[in-house]
Amino acid sequence: MTFRNCVAVDLGASSGRVMLARYQRECRSLTLREIHRFKNGLHSQNGYVTWNVDSLESAIRLGLNKVCEEGIRIDSIGIDTWGVDFVLLDQQGQRVGLPVAYRDSRSNGLMAQAQQQLGKRDIYQRSGIQFLPFNTLYQLRALTEQQPELIPHIAHALLMPDYFSYRLTGKMNWEYTNATTTQLVNINSDDWDESLLAWSGANKAWFGRPTHPGNVIGHWICPQGNEIPVVAVASHDTASAVIASPLNGSRAAYLSSGTWSLMGFESQTPFTNDTALAANITNEGGAEGRYRVLKNIMGLWLLQRVLQERQINDLPALIAATQALPACRFIINPNDDRFINPEAMCSEIQAACRETAQPIPESDAELARCIFDSLALLYADVLHELAQLRGEDFSQLHIVGGGCQNTLLNQLCADACGIRVIAGPVEASTLGNIGIQLMTLDELNNVDDFRQVVSTTANLTTFTPNPDSEIAHYVAQIHSTRQTKELCA
């Protein structure tokens, strides 16, 4: 029997993991084993919100060394992370400045400035990327305006997964799927857009041409002396998660559920018309030249902050208590910028309810109920927008990632969207990371081939919509009110 051992490093905003995958060629079976899991989070440093990249690198190396200590010969390594954030290096490869996180406030107001100076439609036609106040385009502008003393020292700008690959291999790479999240890549050329780069203040020489997933960046030399290839996977974690989504047919949508919720569909062509612009739809790069037509939703970040502030450790107990409460008493817009990084999330949620003359969620369960109901309703709105954009309804929604373990939210989503939900796999980003490695090793033909492997090996759970649920009735009432207003307009 022929086995391949691939290691996926999957870094999220709240945690990271080093996972070992074992693929058996003859029976096309794939198993995952967690080698090392570690925390990630935001830090305050010199007035900025930052990432501790040294700690993350140490955790990555610890995980890789653990695999080697077991006597396992690694065939390849791949790294995926969140998007938009970057690390600056000088000519010697040493860091310049701080690895500032996207939740820092330094780019506040710059998105509106870019739209005014360059034109909102022109930016969108060039990049195809949604307008988010922390996109790399605005972060770089903030850097060059606020810290001009750093500019003479900068030789390279590496996005997060490329930085960690560089630290392992000494080789630089700019992977395409993650590069597209910057709002700096031209959607027609797949290269950096000179007009957008010029506005950002960044030097084009800081960047190399983006490479599509599947190339070998370089090699990591393990403690035993073996040279192990480090593969440029679809290094944006959502791009990897979509690869592992067992999408079946053109009427399947996906929801990558974690700190962020990313809802969308796959397409061979981007959508950059006025309808897409008005809905703030993004066209991020995917594997094999596909586009991830999607929309960002704030996701479980709100819950993570509530858990932290209220010091809640028993999430299953909280969900059980939440399930016993009536639905849709407290509704907020999770995508409101006020929730990006407030000083106190609980107070911010309560203030939003107070300002809209709603009851105030006080208990832990009420806050969680507010978040779950609000997310499910926003999922329904976004799914409707996506269906209108492409001119065809969806028949099923695949929820992948850590958030798909929340059975209450899965059912609320099915009920609010009125669509069958298939939950799983949980470790979608890790699996998609592994999938590209196996293709690079010539073990699999393409993404569709890999999805067949996922469908037969992953644990999937189906949630059927209940039209008689409270949230389904709430959605029906909203639609009825909207139709009445449209008729009277």
From Swiss-Prot:
InterPro entries: ATPase_NBD, FGGY_C, FGGY_N, Rhamnulokinase. It is an enzyme of class 2 (transferase). One of its GO terms (cellular component) is cytosol. Keywords: ATP-binding, Disulfide bond, Kinase, Magnesium, Nucleotide-binding, Rhamnose metabolism, Transferase. Monomer. ATP binds at residues 13-17, 259, 304, 402. The lineage of its organism: Bacteria, Pseudomonadati, Pseudomonadota, Gammaproteobacteria, Enterobacterales. Pathway: Carbohydrate degradation; L-rhamnose degradation; glycerone phosphate from L-rhamnose: step 2/3. It holds the Pfam family FGGY_C. It catalyses: L-rhamnulose + ATP = L-rhamnulose 1-phosphate + ADP + H(+). Its EC number is 2.7.1.5. Its cofactor is Mg(2+). The gene is rhaB. Substrate binds at residues 83, 236-238, 296. This is Rhamnulokinase. HAMAP family: Rhamnulokinase (MF_01535). Disulfide bonds join 68-222, 353-370, 413-417. Belongs to the rhamnulokinase family. Involved in the catabolism of L-rhamnose (6-deoxy-L-mannose). Catalyzes the transfer of the gamma-phosphate group from ATP to the 1-hydroxyl group of L-rhamnulose to yield L-rhamnulose 1-phosphate. GO terms for molecular function: ATP binding; glycerol kinase activity; rhamnulokinase activity. SUPFAM superfamilies: Actin-like ATPase domain. One of its GO terms (biological process) is rhamnose catabolic process. The active site is at residue 237.
